[in-house]
Each structure stands twice: as C-alpha cells, then as structure tokens.
Amino acid sequence: MKDDNIENNNIEEENLNIETQVVANEEIALLKAEIKELQDKLIRTTAEIDNTRKRLEKARDEAKDYAIATFAKELLNVSDNLSRALAHKPSNADVEVTNIISGVQMTKDELDKIFHKHHIEEIKPEIGSMFDYNVHNAISHIEHPDHKPNSIITLMQSGYKIRDRLLRPATVQVVKKP
C-alpha cells in the first residue's frame, strides 16, 4: 500500500508537472503573442512619427518659402525697372553715365542673386513658344501670318514664381487663330 501511495503521489506530481508545463506553455504563447503585437505597434508608431516629422518639415519649408511671397511681389517691379533702365542705356555715354549704368547693373545682379537664394525664378517665355495659361497672361490677341496660332508673339513683362508657386504670370501677346 505504501508503494501504491508513493506511485500515486508520483503520478499526481507528474500530472501536476504536466499541467504546470501546459499552463506555462500557454502563458509563454500568450506572452509571445503580446510581444509580437507590441512590436507591430512599435513599428507602426515609429512609422507614424517619421511620417509626421516629414510632413512637418515639408510644411515648415513651404511656410518659409512662401512667407516672403508678398515681399517678393513688391520687389518684382524694382527688378523690372532696373531691367528697363539697363535695356535703354545710351551707346555713347560719358564716364559718369557709364558708372551709373554699372551701378544699376550691379544692383540688378545683386537682386537676382537674392531672388535665386530664395528660389524666385523669372518666367521669360521665348517668342514663338506656346501660350500656357498656368504661367502666362495674354493681354491681347493679334494676327500674324508667320507664327502659329496660340504662340507668343510679344513678351510685355516677365513673370516670376517661387518654386512651384506663381508670383506673377508673364504678360504676353498671343497670335490668334485666323
């Protein structure tokens, strides 16, 4: 009987060990699943944070670029006037006038450098290029037998843009259909 009790105790201990092992395995499986779920959440959260950071950087860059748009628009007329002054310089100018013209040229060059630094580009379509309503403003349509319809015949005023944002369209005359 003593042997039977020992054997029963051994069997009970063995069953208890098996049950304990089964419970432990179930807990391990649950913990592994929880770890996997937390790792997935971590990956998604990290990606979300990275996307938010990129979105904020882009918004900051755009705000920086376009914050100067109003100020830049006011400088466009200054640039135009400097260009007009340089286009009408006299060919037989004396030394004083030549020095003034040189100063105007240096001012125009410095303004162009500032525009370039702030990604302000001139829109200066070539004669004969096709009219694009996205960047051109047609002030008149004229007939011209030597040019294609809807092509630019005269550039009245250059346009400007900051990166992909239009500050001012180029003012042009366009050939109309016959």
UniProtKB/Swiss-Prot annotation:
Superkingdom in the source lineage: Bacteria
Subcellular location: Cytoplasm
Name of the protein in its database record: Protein GrpE
One Pfam family here: GrpE
GO-annotated biological processes: protein folding; protein import into mitochondrial matrix
GO terms under cellular component: cytoplasm
Known role: Participates actively in the response to hyperosmotic and heat shock by preventing the aggregation of stress-denatured proteins, in association with DnaK and GrpE. It is the nucleotide exchange factor for DnaK and may function as a thermosensor. Unfolded proteins bind initially to DnaJ; upon interaction with the DnaJ-bound protein, DnaK hydrolyzes its bound ATP, resulting in the formation of a stable complex. GrpE releases ADP from DnaK; ATP binding to DnaK triggers the release of the substrate protein, thus completing the reaction cycle.
Family: Belongs to the GrpE family.
InterPro entries: GrpE, GrpE_coiled_coil, GrpE_head
Assembly notes: Homodimer.
